[in-house]
Regions:
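Sequence-structural signature of mature extracellular/luminal beta-sheet repeat domains
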Residues: 1-354
Length: 354
């Protein structure tokens, strides 16, 4: 989960701390098992379940796609007194730099490959092994006589509901035309213009939403955060929209865990008040809410009184990753130095043989 406090510092539950800067600096704030996790990061993040890798997107200029991987031991160094580490510690493994205009938001595994929503290009991109990004899907509405328009953010194509293939996936956007004001501009009229695109047809399959985010397949249904009205909705293949739950805040961030869906809410940024016609800004809270998938009942909430924005939520099994490099409450410089000096990933081979 990614959140931002009123002072502008970002806090992330269950992920490492990342400060996004033009140089792409990466550092960490850890958690201790059994304690409330709190740390920080940029916007989208995604777990690659087959390998246990965590991918985190920073949307600063340049964009940076970080890869983090669990370390389960120390290298057999003769200059160390410590012989091991406790648990599976999430450590930095790589970074990929992309133009700031890519404007990465959501990340998702579609089939075996990592994909991202390149909001600045009105497209979905894949990330080839050799670096960079490659456009692999875009809605037909950006195509004209001169080809597809990847040069301006026309749609705010920000969310991915990942299926087994692009054709089986769905994507959210704030509108489906290239006319008039664009998302991000204050004069952009938002109410009822949001859509869900079908990956198969590249056309809207659902209309009437307001600044939708975080589409996810929950059980056998497609759930979407209808942010401008502070709700979570279930969208049918026939274009129908059913309200599942109403919450006190700008809904964004959605993750299913067992029989619950965890939904994030954020405060309204004052200059974007017009983007939330269905909300009362003074009543909005920054928090996480557990929604019963069958009934839509909110069974529990965790609210940060000084919080501001939540961007994304991802569940990471503790058997894959059970702690982070640093304990924010009890720092241990010697152990931290040893960990960064000689950590070993579970997939590492000490000797390469021909």
């Amino acid at each position: 989960m990614v959140a931002e406090s009123r002072r502008g510092r970002r806090h992330l539950a269950g992920q490492p701390r990342i400060r996004a800067s033009p140089a792409g600096a990466l550092d960490g704030l850890g958690i201790t098992p059994g304690e409330l996790p709190q740390a920080a990061a940029p916007v989208g993040h995604c777990l690659r379940r087959g390998t246990g890798e965590v991918h985190v997107a920073s949307t600063r200029n340049p964009n940076v796609l970080y890869t983090l991987r669990a370390a389960d031991g120390l290298l057999p160094r003769r200059d160390l007194t410590s012989k091991g580490i406790a648990g599976n510690v999430l450590m930095p493994a790589g970074a990929r730099f992309l133009p700031g205009s890519t404007y990465l938001h959501d990340l998702a595994m579609i089939g075996p490959e990592l994909h991202g929503s390149a909001v600045g290009e009105n497209a979905i991109v894949a990330f080839p092994a050799l670096g960079g990004s490659q456009r692999v899907w875009w809605p037909s509405c950006i195509e004209g006589d001169a080809g597809a328009d990847f040069g301006l953010n026309h749609l705010q194509l920000n969310g991915i509901a990942a299926g087994k293939s692009l054709a089986e996936s769905c994507f959210t956007a704030s509108k489906d035309d290239l006319v008039g004001a664009r998302p991000g501009q204050i004069e952009f009229a938002v109410e009822g213009r949001g859509v869900i695109f079908s990956g198969a047809t590249r056309l809207p399959m659902t209309r009437g939403l307001t600044r939708p985010h975080s589409p996810r397949f929950v059980s056998d249904a497609l759930w979407v955060a209808n942010s401008g009205f502070g709700s979570v909705v279930s969208c049918g293949q026939d274009g129908s929209v059913e309200i599942v739950a109403r919450l006190r805040g700008w809904t964004r961030g959605l993750c299913a865990i067992g029989n619950l869906a965890i939904v994030g809410t954020s405060r309204i940024i004052p200059r974007f008040r017009a983007y939330a016609p269905g909300l009362e800004p003074d009543r909005c809270v920054c928090g996480l809410h557990a929604v019963d998938i069958k009934s839509g009942r909110v069974v529990a909430s965790l609210v940060w009184p000084a919080g501001n924005q939540i961007f994304a939520i991802e569940a990471v099994p503790s058997r894959m990753i059970d702690r982070l490099p640093f304990d924010g409450f009890r720092r241990m410089p010697g152990a931290e130095q040893t960990l960064f000096y000689a950590w070993q990933a579970g997939s590492r081979n000490d000797v390469r043989r021909n």
